[in-house]
A protein has these predicted regions:
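Phosphate/ribose-recognition catalytic cores of enzymes acting on nucleotide-derived substrates
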Residues: 15, 221-348
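Active-site-adjacent structural elements in enzyme catalytic cores
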Residues: 67, 87, 91-92, 99-108, ...
Length: 348
């Protein structure tokens, strides 16, 4: 049975996506692109992977202070994420690409996003150098909001107390936000990944404040789907590791419209695929999506990806998946293969 989305969203920050927001958020790519006009801001720092409800709490505090001080609200994040530099392919799967972080943040009344290149040289600078050269000299930070677990500088030696001391010396205020909790659990990117892996999509949606979304440009595939009555839009997953896999009931956002469908996220082992991709079939849709930018919202997990003994067996399972997804959305059983409807009638 389909869950009630209204029951999931128990936290509604004042900077929600539905709120009126600034038309444009400035993207500053690299420390070398910080200009004198960028001095003077309220700032928060982090990975913002997934831009989840815990991040929302930090951003709400940031925006509140930006209004009070009449200063720009700025988010500093890192590319690659620090663990991707230190751990390589062993780093946790990303929830969001940089573009997806930008899209999420620009709807939250943030004025600037500073993307810092995280390389070995940057990682080895001392905490004091980070504070004095970047926060004070270049950004002129007046107010800093960080999570209660924030660490920085070589060996992660910098912490909230060091920032507080620096604030007293250089004249900026530092606030530590307490971790946002749902059902007594600290909301974190790690917790979101665990729920995604387990297929608990309602829980994921509750922690993110929205459905988990994969975005990208529709590319040409091998067109196997159309040979069995299920043409698909294909998105290459340009990530070292993907955080989610399997078959899902989805909604696809394209050109201001929303279409329900069914999608597979994975390597397609039955047809000897090797690279992860997202293949989505839109219900009752006719049109050409090639080259278009789309967002795929993963609403409900149907099953894990699996390898079938034959292409015929795969086709039959795809038919069952489509039937299950339509049922989850409460859609009529139209435009399904007659053989599948006959099987359903027999089973009933």
């Amino acid at each position: 049975m389909r869950a009630d989305p209204a029951s999931w969203l128990i936290y509604n920050p004042p900077i929600s996506m539905a709120a009126t927001h600034k038309a444009l958020m400035e993207l500053i790519r690299g420390i070398h692109n910080i200009k004198p006009r960028h001095r003077g801001c309220v700032l928060t720092i982090g990975n913002f992977d997934g831009v989840h409800q815990g991040h929302h709490a930090v951003l709400a505090r940031l925006q509140e202070k930006a209004v009070q001080l009449e200063l720009p609200a700025c988010v500093m994040l890192f590319e690659p994420q620090p663990l991707e530099l230190f751990a390589g392919s062993a780093a946790p799967a990303r929830l969001s690409r940089l573009r997806e972080k930008y899209e999420a943040l620009k709807g939250m009344q943030i004025d600037r996003m500073l993307c810092v290149r995280f390389n070995q040289r940057f990682a080895e600078q001392s905490p004091n150098s980070f504070i004095e050269q970047l926060l004070v000299e270049k950004l002129g930070v007046r107010y800093l909001v960080v999570g209660d677990d924030f660490r920085f500088g070589k060996g992660r030696e910098g912490d909230f107390h060091l920032l507080e001391e620096a604030g007293h010396r250089f004249g900026f205020e530092v606030i530590s936000t307490q971790s946002f909790q749902l059902e007594r659990q600290r909301v974190s990117s790690t917790l979101v990944r665990e729920a995604l892996k387990a297929g608990r999509m309602a829980e994921v949606e509750m922690m993110l404040g929205r459905p988990y979304t994969i975005s990208g440009r529709v590319a040409h595939g091998d067109k196997l789907g159309r040979t069995i009555g299920f043409p698909t839009a294909n998105l290459a997953l340009k990530r070292q590791v993907i955080p989610v896999g399997g078959v899902f009931a989805v909604e696809v956002l394209c050109s201001g419209k929303t279409f329900p469908g069914v999608a597979n996220v994975g390597v397609r082992p039955t047809v000897h695929g090797t690279q992860a991709r997202l293949e989505v079939h839109l219900f009752d849709f006719s049109g050409d999506l090639y080259g278009q930018q789309v967002k795929v919202l993963l609403r409900h997990k149907l099953r894990e990806e699996q390898k079938f003994a034959s292409f015929t067996a795969l086709k039959e399972q795809i038919e069952r998946d489509a039937l299950a997804a339509r049922a989850w959305f409460g859609l009529p059983l139209l435009n399904l293969p007659s053989t599948l409807l006959e099987k359903k009638g027999t089973q009933d």
